[in-house]
Amino acid sequence: MNLRLKRWITAGATLAMVATMGLSACSTNRALSSETGKNEVTMASRTPNWIFPISAKGYTQGENGQFIQSLYRPLFAYKSTSETPYKINLPKSLGQVPDVSEDGKTYTITLRDDAKWSDGTAVSTRDIEFWWNLVTNNKDQWASYKEGFFPDGASLAVLDEHTFSITTEEVFNPSWFIDNQINKVALLPQHAWDKTSADEAVSDLDRTPEGAQAVFAYLQGEAKDLSSYAKNPLWQTVNGPWKLSSFTPDQGLELVPNENYWGEDKPKIDKLIYKAFTGDDAEFNSVRSGAIDFGYIPAASYNQRSAVESKGYNVFLWPGNTITYLALNFAPQAPGSKFINQKYIRQAMQQLIDQPTLSEKIWSNTASPTCGPVPMPADKVGTTDGCVYKFDPDAAKKLLEDHGWKVVPDGSTTCENPGTGDNQCGEGIEAGDALSFKLVSQSGFVSTHQMFEEIISQFGKLGIKIDMNEVPDSVGASQACDDETPCTWDLSFFGSQTSWGFPIYASGERLFATDAPVNLGQYSNPEADKLIEESTRSTEPDALQAYNDFLAEDLPVLWMPNPYYQITAVKNTLDLGELDATGDTWPEDWAWKTDGAK
């Protein structure tokens, strides 16, 4: 599971590859599938578990963003090939390009004046103000919030029904602020949602802190009731091209066109069906039988690509601006944190992960090494150029022995020289302590399981034990620890389809800053915090590079093979419109090709 909401980007060369698959739009009229006689599309997808456009902790799985985006148009969508400033995808956005003041502190944004909610009410800056009031009075409940970052140190001014401004106390890099901060702003239907119960009349409750907290609690509570999604009137007030018609948790959902959608990009199909599967095998069986229109091939089955293509599918690799990593739990409550907090142990562990071989043999070359917190440049993807640590078991063994460990291959490596000296095991580690870790990983992904079988075997050769527990939701099973939350994990993997996808600007304030919202392992380093902050302020390219170089070496996580977001299999009679490497999907642009179309 990918933790990001929905945002990926890669180099233009990848787009060229995608374009060669013949997937750009070639028809704008509705057309029935020649195979089914129906104007609907069935796609493989985990069922989303969140519908409220304000993200919540514990509900950040990747499918949520695409689902919400279909119902609620974003203030800003992005496109990696866009020539619009800040890579904004204007046709899919409710906002126009921000105007930045000369002092760099005020961002003035004008909304489209033709956008409407599905009940006919005009989209306006009141919907922006509503979002602002809910978020600023419930920051501790918002998954995207980190203290000291947006909306802290910023103020909102409503200028008219379609214009607002955000003013910051300090100057930031405009690209970072627009692409990574203002992109979190959502328009919410104040006229339909500003209440605290289903039968209460809408009012301006959000304009007081108490009212905003009560409204937020009501909306968040309703969003947690997944079984009610399709029948709850709240979620029928949308401004996107789609409306929800059915929803069954863990099984799937159906979207139908919003008949009152205001945009020119009205859906060309009559129904979009999200079908959930229990795992890779079940999904791939559906692809092989031709029962699904838009699915994927598991990496372990990539060698069956030709057979899939013979069933009438186009197959292509869908990459992204992503990294994949194994989260490390630095929290004192974690069973193995005393080991993880020793940098030399992290270094030894990284040197036991053979990323090139795992990428080739396990992932069938549908993954490539991750070297640090910033995605690899396009010309280095597939290499370890720039990686601080290469696969080197001998160096890993020497690190352990040089720090007081008795390495017992295929046995149990233990500390025999405790203490805090340069040649000792380190703080908190006692004589006889065995080097072992508890791993939480994702179930249902064949390549992930095979990869960790190999990694566990490799670690075992140096007497390091890893106990693996595979669960459907590894993020939910490895939340940040505290004194009140039982803490049973040391390592957590949720990167079967990459761990994290970045917006246009790949900074790390949400991942690796102290107390960051997605810093599950509670990594904290003052130098990292300093470099992260500098990367958000400076317009110099070396600021982001300096941040990357430090964390690549310091190992807040272990860098892992980074899978393509998806090995996509799509019926060759289904036109997906223009596919962009951001990973965003726009189902309203999809259409079945008419007879004779190519």
Enumerate the predicted regions with their spans:
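Aromatic- and charge-enriched surface segment that lines or borders ligand/interaction sites
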Residues: 96-142, 159, 165-167, 175, ...
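Append "and occasionally in soluble cytosolic enzymes with long acidic Gly/Pro-rich linkers
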Residues: 236, 256, 340-457, 598
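Extracellular/periplasmic solute-recognition and catalytic clefts
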Residues: 135-145, 155-158, 245-260, 273-337, ...
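N-terminal lobe/hinge region of extracytoplasmic solute-binding protein
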Residues: 44-102, 133, 237
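C-terminal motif of bacterial Sec signal peptides marking the signal peptidase cleavage site
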Residues: 22-25
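Surface-exposed binding/hinge segments that line
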Residues: 147-219
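Bacterial signal peptide processing site
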Residues: 27-29
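Extracytoplasmic/peripheral linker and loop segments enriched in polar/acidic and small residues
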Residues: 346-347, 359, 465-482, 505-572, ...
